[in-house]
A protein has these predicted regions:
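Non-catalytic interfacial helical region
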Residues: 2-19, 25-34, 38-230, 234, ...
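C-terminal alpha-helical interaction modules of replication/initiation AAA+ assemblies
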Residues: 224-227, 239-309
């Protein structure tokens, strides 16, 4: 049972998501699921898993109902949830876009005493339900709550590495940098691009390279923000200007706001490294290890430290 207290982090979201996936795969279902938050990826994956595994294909015709918040109302949802299943153990009711319901709090009339033969899935995207409401409190007590938080820039690469590993592959650091540089922290978009990439890779490929990314996703391995900050660190002005000129000529593929964000983060890290050097010289502070410095700079891997030393 999910207990909603305190501010949820992306790490909390991933932990809760993985636990729910295991519980559902094992057939241990809750009577009510509240899947809410800004990151739609985890909400969709849990809803899809429940839709595809609780009932057999034959049972779904009679016992699985999918409605959309903008096209239904709370009373209709409650009536569906109170129906008895026909020729099956469960009635599955999935409410998508529940944030569009006019009065979602009215669902508390059902969640106060949910039917043990119904699995109600409430997908509340883009924001979180008010945790002070009776609806939220009921579901925390009687069901499962997944609060889906978007990752920060420095969190996405670790998740991405784990995601690729779960598919039986690894990915080189430069390829990771290219993906996150181009696609940002949009997990749904990144996972879709990787899913397509994995279908195109030669059979037996176990490591995704920068060349694979360029050939199959269309992100240049030579002209991207990852290469721009690397050229700046190496004081290779000609290379940096060449990349900047490429960006100027291809603004659609290289948005200025993304580049500015990458440059800000890069110089912020350089400042932190130089401040640490000053502390070592003037305050006799012990030098941090590579792992400690990597964590301080919020780098996904100590591999990237050479850019800042």
């Amino acid at each position: 049972m999910a207990k909603g207290s305190g501010k949820t982090t992306f790490k909390d979201t991933v932990t809760a998501y993985e636990r729910l996936r295991r519980e559902i795969a094992a057939g241990r279902y809750a009577p009510v699921y509240l899947l809410m938050g800004e990151e739609g990826y985890f909400i969709d994956r849990i809803a899809d898993q429940l839709a595809g595994t609780v009932l057999t294909e034959a049972e779904r015709d009679f016992n699985q109902i999918v409605v959309y918040g903008k096209d239904t109302d709370e009373g209709t949802i409650i009536n569906y949830a109170r129906q008895m299943p026909m020729m099956g153990r469960y009635e599955v009711v999935i409410v998508k876009e529940a944030q569009s319901l006019r009065k979602p709090e009215q669902l508390s009339l059902y969640t106060a005493a949910p039917s043990p033969s119904t699995i109600l899935v409430v997908c509340y995207k883009g924001k979180s339900l008010d945790k002070r409401t009776q609806l939220y409190k009921h579901i925390v007590q009687k069901g499962e709550v997944l609060e889906s938080v978007r990752p920060r820039d420095y969190e996405i690469t670790a998740w991405l590495g784990d995601f690729v590993q779960s598919k039986g592959c690894t990915i080189e650091p430069k390829a990771l940098g290219m993906l996150t540089d181009h696609l940002g922290t949009d997990i749904s978009r990144i996972s879709n691009e990787l899913a397509k990439l994995l279908t195109f890779l030669p059979e037996g490929t176990k490591r995704i390279t920068a060349q694979h990314i360029e050939d199959n996703i269309g992100i240049s391995k030579d002209f991207n923000n990852f290469e721009l900050t690397k050229a700046i660190s190496e004081k290779n002005m000609a290379r940096a200007m060449l990349i900047a000129d490429h960006f100027r000529r291809n603004p659609k593929d290289n948005p200025l706001t993304v580049t500015l964000s990458a440059l800000f983060t890069h110089f912020q890290r350089i400042f932190i490294v130089n401040y640490k050097r000053w502390e070592i010289r003037h305050k006799n502070v012990p030098a941090p290890s590579d792992a400690e410095l990597s964590a301080l700079l919020k780098l996904p891997n100590p591999f990237f430290l050479n850019e800042y030393k």
